Amino acid sequence: MEKLATTVSEPHAKREYKDTVFRMLFSDKEKLLSLYNAMNDRHYENAEDLKIVTLKNAIYMGMKNDLAFMVDTQICLYEHQSTKNPNMPLRDMFYISLEYQAYVNNKSLYCSTLQKLHTPKFVIFYNGTEDLEECTELRLSDAYENLEGEPNLELRVIVLNVSEGCNRKLMEHCQVLKEYAQYVAKVRRYTAEMELDAAVKRAVEECIAEGILEDFLRENRAEVEMVSILEYDKDFEEKKLREAEYEAGREEGARFGLAEGIVETGCADSVPEPDILARL
């Protein structure tokens, strides 16, 4: 089976794309292969069996994906998230469509031969502070309005909670993922006690001393600290935005309920329409 076209994104796009510690860590083929093996109960040993797939211009189009790669006849889209996003099935549909377009480029879709495609698998690794079950599923059909019967188009995304203490069996089979969860837990714990910069530095120092992601942190310490600070700031701002949106929605709902009550009472009391409008 032919492999998907792989291209390297332009340098400007890389600068604009905000990296994460998760993506930095698993961009290494050996580590990514260990995660894939743990996820699928496989025993691949040669990292070259895994091919990283990068879509040219995907970042510019707002369709970035943390880790897109192929193993055998599968194409896997892995993404790390620290906030819940129910729109991931739609995002993944857009992204995988670009992958398939790249694969069948210059091939006729009107011939009598079936064009074979890599089997897709979509996974989100969640480690936010909101409560989430160890394994949940998002479906594209959840977004359909007035769906009747089975959907003609479906896309399922598995969401795994990889916070420390969750999905222990998976962690046992992927030491790198387990240590990543330990690092994140330390950052969060110390952030509650001290300034963010100091919390990240302490977490990194402690992990190195305890042999947690030791080589990775020694080799990438400055970048990991910077990215961790940016990640936490981003999470904090998104949390504040969600809280503000919730409060605005609650206030709007209260105002709507009050107005609805005025109209209903006025109509019941046969109050003239101009007088009802004046009360609103």
Locations of regions flagged by a protein language model:
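Elongated, amphipathic alpha-helical interaction scaffolds
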Residues: 1-280
